[in-house]
Amino acid sequence: MIRLYPEQLRAQLNEGLRAAYLLLGNDPLLLQESQDAVRQVAAAQGFEEHHTFSIDPNTDWNAIFSLCQAMSLFASRQTLLLLLPENGPNAAINEQLLTLTGLLHDDLLLIVRGNKLSKAQENAAWFTALANRSVQVTCQTPEQAQLPRWVAARAKQLNLELDDAANQVLCYCYEGNLLALAQALERLSLLWPDGKLTLPRVEQAVNDAAHFTPFHWVDALLMGKSKRALHILQQLRLEGSEPVILLRTLQRELLLLVNLKRQSAHTPLRALFDKHRVWQNRRGMMGEALNRLSQTQLRQAVQLLTRTELTLKQDYGQSVWAELEGLSLLLCHKPLADVFIDG
């Protein structure tokens, strides 16, 4: 199976259409643009009919199979778009998809769109059956480290000259929100017809529309990035996130840190990570936090988190965003006012 990113898709399509395109990921912009690109190239090659089915327990699979088999001398070529359920295909859907793979032909182009599949879902028979004749396009929202490269490529597409400082501002303001980022670049191209995007020009035209989850906040805390952690917290507050969800998300990681710190005095970290089943991609930031924070600081963080939870239990309407900021600074190893630590 050919695996590529959305920015590589156009080049592959120009080489020749495959039997199926699997558009998988969580980013609405990348999914939609990839879908549009496949259908656009297919239309240029005579695929004039486009059919779309949302897959759920009530899907009429016989209608889909009939569509695949309805061939006549005058029938036009057609694309078939299947929208997978949010959690991906279950066993029953896998069976139907396997049947469908046996009905594909040169005048039918299959497009499957959905969230990223798990390893178990990728081992399903239908997925394996498509391996030699399909393209998988990874449509995940770029992480912080990959975002500047995406912005630079997008700017180049629009014939914009973007300096590094301007790129950083765009990433800061629109991380996790590619649709708003793409719209900002298009707006900037209209504002500045010469295509030169300097820092002052970009700062005049952007607004902070980054989108984060509580996990982004926790990751920033583990890495000791106080400025980023406070920015994420501000955006989560503006979006109406529930503080109790932030506290629960942090609590799990904080208690794990406390245990790891205590046990690391006599056991190697790698063995502890294995024992506590810490994912490989989280071990680096966990190690950073353990090296940076003392047992005293971790104990203070647990006390502050517990006190904040009690405040919410006693009065759910009470604002605890100041306490969450205090927690952020404490875990990023910044000096805290005594009011946070001593209560």
Curated annotation (Swiss-Prot):
Name of the top EC class for this enzyme: transferase
Pfam families: DNA_pol3_delt_C (PF14840), DNA_pol3_delta (PF06144)
Family stated for the protein in its record: Belongs to the DNA polymerase HolA subunit family.
Name of the featured protein: DNA polymerase III subunit delta
Gene Ontology terms describing biological process: DNA replication; DNA-templated DNA replication
GO molecular function: DNA binding; DNA clamp loader activity; DNA-directed DNA polymerase activity
The UniProt record lists the keyword Transferase: yes
Native source organism of the sequence: Escherichia coli (strain K12)
